[in-house]
């Protein structure tokens, strides 16, 4: 159940009519660091507003790996901007549960920004505690694929 502070922050977001108000409302939600805010922060990624999405992304990253399952099931397949932000969060969190989504994004997404973020995610996935050689192989295969991508930003992400 959402706290009174979180409920008030959600209401502030709903009332926002400008970018500045959206940023402030999203900052208020993110600052609470409440896991119940994750779905709203994910929804904000789809507002097609980079300033707001950046704040929401940082809020999701601060929530940590606990948000990974919500990221995996709330991906907006019709909004490449939102997909890019979600993939960026997954890449930053380095959680191996994102492997399948990162692979799919690299192989099938039309947007170079999504493929680039997926490439970085595959390169930086935290497999140190994993004894899963298959996951490491899949990451390497993905990076090799990214190295042959038509877009230089994706190839660059694979190389560096």
Question: Where are each of the predicted segments found?
Answer:
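Alpha-solenoid HEAT/Armadillo-like helical repeat scaffolds in large eukaryotic proteins
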Residues: 8-16, 40-48, 70-78, 101-109, ...
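Hydrophobic secondary-structure block in the mid-to-C-terminal portion of proteins
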Residues: 138, 142-160
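Structural detector for internal amphipathic alpha-helices that build alpha-solenoid repeat scaffolds
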Residues: 1, 19-34, 43, 51-66, ...
């Amino acid at each position: 159940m959402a706290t009174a502070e979180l409920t008030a922050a959600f209401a502030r977001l709903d009332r926002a009519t400008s970018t500045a108000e959206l940023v402030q409302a999203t900052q208020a939600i993110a600052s609470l660091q409440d896991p119940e805010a994750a779905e709203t922060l994910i929804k904000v990624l789809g507002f097609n507003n980079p300033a707001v999405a950046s704040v929401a992304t940082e809020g999701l990253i601060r929530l940590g790996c606990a948000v990974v399952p919500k990221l995996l099931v709330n991906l907006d397949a019709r909004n490449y901007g939102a997909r890019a932000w979600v993939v960026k969060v997954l890449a930053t969190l380095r959680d191996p549960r994102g492997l399948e989504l990162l692979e799919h994004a690299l192989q099938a997404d039309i947007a170079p920004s999504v493929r680039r973020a997926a490439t970085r995610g595959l390169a930086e996935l935290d497999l140190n505690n994993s004894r899963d050689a298959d996951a490491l192989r899949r990451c390497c295969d993905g990076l090799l694929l990214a190295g042959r991508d038509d877009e230089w930003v994706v190839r660059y992400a694979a190389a560096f």
